[in-house]
């Protein structure tokens, strides 16, 4: 009995020491984090951008898709249980309905906002990319945060002094929804150089949740991009990582432009895939029957959205917003932001495909 008590004491003391050591390490890491003020972002040169790509690609043979292969869903053929092969058709049917239900107003800046401009929104999104890199957050967290911002601004008027508060609080909510170990409120106060208090962020969190009616799982372009990218790789004998990173880059670029709000997330995802295939193989038609079947978009349906992303890629729009561009110039993302592209999109690429 005495031995058991002694062992218990030893275990308790050991556990206490381990806990104290972990807390000290966390405090040290928090102290080392750089405070980031929204207005200072263009001058930041040493902000951390070290989210390691953990996606592992499984090698598989490449075959040219035929009409017959359309009957065999690529998700059903996948050996990844997370793809939910048996239910994928129903899941994506639901997501297509949900994206329409949860979309923001396409002209909320003109109709709802009095103090916020499209340029302010772009600067905010660019800053949130820096925040996501600083805390090594998932891309889904960033997409959700931006969607919460657009949805909230479609419902409530916000003055420009509180726009950053809306952005950082949206990132907090998205982190809680997506991340295993999300940053806490103090972290988000710190990253804004204590521009806002903990109480202000908590109050804004409640306001956002009530305005969105606690509906936080809305699909984003990243939701559809995963599946569309898999289809796009079926007839490409090239690095799958390069295709994935380029599609992700184009999709993230779209968030900078307020005009992207008028497109459904699935439209943005399909347009990113379309333009990525054009960039990689400019002499080949970027669309095919298989992509048309899975995305439910014809090439002509994507013309306006593809043109918008193409302008963003060439820095014709939002050229001063560099966070996403610098992020994808890194070798860990295959430097996809530096890939050359034609300054003009031939009209022939938007013709319907018959084979």
From Swiss-Prot:
Transmembrane segments: none annotated. One of its GO terms (biological process) is mitotic cell cycle phase transition. Keywords: Cell cycle, Cell division, Cyclin. CDD domains: CYCLIN_AtCycA-like_rpt2, CYCLIN_AtCycA_like_rpt1. SMART domains: CYCLIN (SM00385), Cyclin_C (SM01332). One of its GO terms (molecular function) is cyclin-dependent protein serine/threonine kinase regulator activity. Belongs to the cyclin family. Cyclin AB subfamily. This is Putative cyclin-A3-1. It comes from Arabidopsis thaliana. The lineage of its organism: Eukaryota, Viridiplantae, Streptophyta, Embryophyta, Tracheophyta.
């Amino acid at each position: 009995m005495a031995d058991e008590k002694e062992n218990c004491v030893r275990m308790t003391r050991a556990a206490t020491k381990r806990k104290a050591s972990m807390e000290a390490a966390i405090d040290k890491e928090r102290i080392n984090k750089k405070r980031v003020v929204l207005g200072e972002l263009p001058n930041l040169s040493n902000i951390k951008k070290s989210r390691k790509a953990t996606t592992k690609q499984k090698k598989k043979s490449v075959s040219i898709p035929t009409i017959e292969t359309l009957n065999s869903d690529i998700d059903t053929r996948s050996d990844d249980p997370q793809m939910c092969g048996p239910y994928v058709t129903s899941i994506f049917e639901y997501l297509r309905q949900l994206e329409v239900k949860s979309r923001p107003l396409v002209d909320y800046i003109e109709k709802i906002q009095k103090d916020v401009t499209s340029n302010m929104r772009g600067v905010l999104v660019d800053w949130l990319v820096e925040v996501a890199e600083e805390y090594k957050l998932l891309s889904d967290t960033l997409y959700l945060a931006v969607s919460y911002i657009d949805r909230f601004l479609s419902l409530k008027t916000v003055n420009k002094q509180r726009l950053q508060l809306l952005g950082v609080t949206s990132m907090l909510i998205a982190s809680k929804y997506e991340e295993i170990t999300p940053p806490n409120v103090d972290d988000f106060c710190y990253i804004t150089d204590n521009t806002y208090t903990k109480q202000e962020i908590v109050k804004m969190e409640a306001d956002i949740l009530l305005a969105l009616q606690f509906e936080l799982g809305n699909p984003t372009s990243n939701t559809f991009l995963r599946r569309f990218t898999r289809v796009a790789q079926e007839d490409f004998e090239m690095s799958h990582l390069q295709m994935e990173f380029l599609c992700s880059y184009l999709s993230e670029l779209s968030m900078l432009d307020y005009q992207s709000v008028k497109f459904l997330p699935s439209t943005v995802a399909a347009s990113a895939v379309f333009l990525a295939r054009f960039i990689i193989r400019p002499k080949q038609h970027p669309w095919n029957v298989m992509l048309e079947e899975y995305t439910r978009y014809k090439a002509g349906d994507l013309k306006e959205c593809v043109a918008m992303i193409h302008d963003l890629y060439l820095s014709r729009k939002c050229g001063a917003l560099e966070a996403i561009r610098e992020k994808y110039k890194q070798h860990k993302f295959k430097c996809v932001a530096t890939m050359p592209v034609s300054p003009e999109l031939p009209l022939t690429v938007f013709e319907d495909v018959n084979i």
